[in-house]
Design a protein with these regions (language model features):
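Hydrophobic positions on the alpha1 helix immediately C-terminal to the Walker A/P-loop
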Residues: 17, 21
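Post-Walker A helix-loop "phosphate-sensing" segment adjacent to the P-loop in P-loop NTPases
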Residues: 23-33
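Extreme N-terminal starter segment of soluble prokaryotic enzymes
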Residues: 1-4
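Conserved phosphate-donor/acceptor-positioning beta-strand/loop module used by diverse small-molecule
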Residues: 96-103, 109-132
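P-loop (Walker A) phosphate-binding loop of NTP-binding proteins
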Residues: 9
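ATP-dependent small-molecule kinase phosphotransfer cores
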Residues: 35-95
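Small-molecule kinase domains that catalyze NTP-dependent phosphoryl transfer to phosphate-bearing small molecules
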Residues: 77, 82, 121-151
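Conserved lysine of the Walker
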Residues: 14
Length: 151
C-alpha cells in the first residue's frame, strides 16, 4: 500500500486534491481509501463534547482545542498511530491510502519510521485570503509544517 499524505493550510484544497487523486487512481483500477486524521477527532468532539459538526469559529476552536491542545500535547502520535494501525491491520485492502489533513511533522515522520511507503504532497492556494481568525491562522495546526519540504 502506498500512502499519500497531503498537507496545506485550511481551505487550500487538500480534500479536493485527494478527491482528484482518488478518481484518477480508481479510473486506473486501483483501490483507494481516503482517511483523515481528524475523522476520529470529529467523532470524539461530537460524542463527548457536543460539537454540532459545523466548522464555524466555535467548531474550529473545539477541534483545535481537543485535537491539538489536549490530545496532541499528551499523546503526540495519537492520531497518526490510529491511521498506521488501520494500514497495518488491512495492508491488502487498498492500493492507496490518502490522508488529506496532514498538519504536523510527526504525522509524516511517524509513518516513515513505521516502514510504510509514503509520499508527502503540499497543496498551496495562491492569492487566497483565509477566512480564519488571526488566532486560528497562528495555531500550531496551521503553522507546524511551514518550514518543511514536501517530497
Amino acid at each position: 500500500m502506498k500512502i499519500i499524505a497531503i498537507s496545506g493550510k485550511a481551505q487550500h484544497g487538500k480534500d479536493t486534491t485527494a478527491g482528484f487523486l482518488k478518481s484518477a487512481l480508481e479510473a486506473d483500477g486501483y483501490k483507494v481509501q481516503v482517511a483523515h486524521y481528524a475523522d476520529l477527532l470529529k467523532y470524539i468532539c461530537k460524542q463527548f463534547f457536543g460539537w454540532n459538526g459545523q466548522k464555524d469559529d466555535a467548531g474550529r476552536h473545539i477541534l483545535q482545542y481537543v485535537g491539538t491542545d489536549v490530545i496532541r500535547t499528551q499523546k503526540p502520535d495519537f492520531w497518526v498511530d490510529f491511521i498506521i494501525s488501520m494500514a497495518e491491520l488491512f495492508p491488502d485492502t487498498w492500493d492507496y491510502l490518502l490522508i488529506p489533513d496532514c498538519r504536523f511533522p510527526n504525522e509524516i515522520d511517524r509513518i516513515k519510521s513505521a516502514g510504510l511507503d509514503m509520499v508527502h504532497l503540499r497543496v498551496v492556494r495562491k492569492n487566497f485570503t483565509s477566512p480564519l481568525s488571526k488566532e486560528q491562522q497562528a495555531h500550531p495546526s496551521e503553522t507546524a509544517l511551514d518550514n518543511t519540504t514536501p517530497d
